[in-house]
Amino acid sequence: MNNIERSINELGYAVVPITGTSMLPLLKEGRDRVELEPCSQERLKKGDVVLYKKNDGTLVLHRIIKTKNREFFTVLGDHQFKNAERVNKNQIIAVACGFFIKGRYVTEKTRWYRMYKKIWLCNLNFRRIILAVLSLKK
């Protein structure tokens, strides 16, 4: 068990810095953090950001894009439009209950975040176009 899992199990939450680029444009490495809490697989839904453990032990933070049953979930990083992974419910360690983005605390109740989530989940082809436009701005 690593420090993140230990904190979630013992304290009931963990605040973790973002690493990697798979959750751009929402979450940026070196700038943002995610607040995680234990989750009940029965309450997980499309759009939730979850921390799961891959078979090799790597921890990954991605968004649920499909829930067909309560046994498996399809997850994908916000900065991706292909290579979605099918995750067993037992691999899911925690769910994001909030984010520290540019120093501000954001939750499911934050209006702009709800809009972002709807847009981001609506269509993977649309996501590809948005990511292409955002990469041109750099």
Report each predicted region and the residues it spans:
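Extended hydrophobic leader/signal-anchor segments used for secretion and membrane insertion
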Residues: 1-138
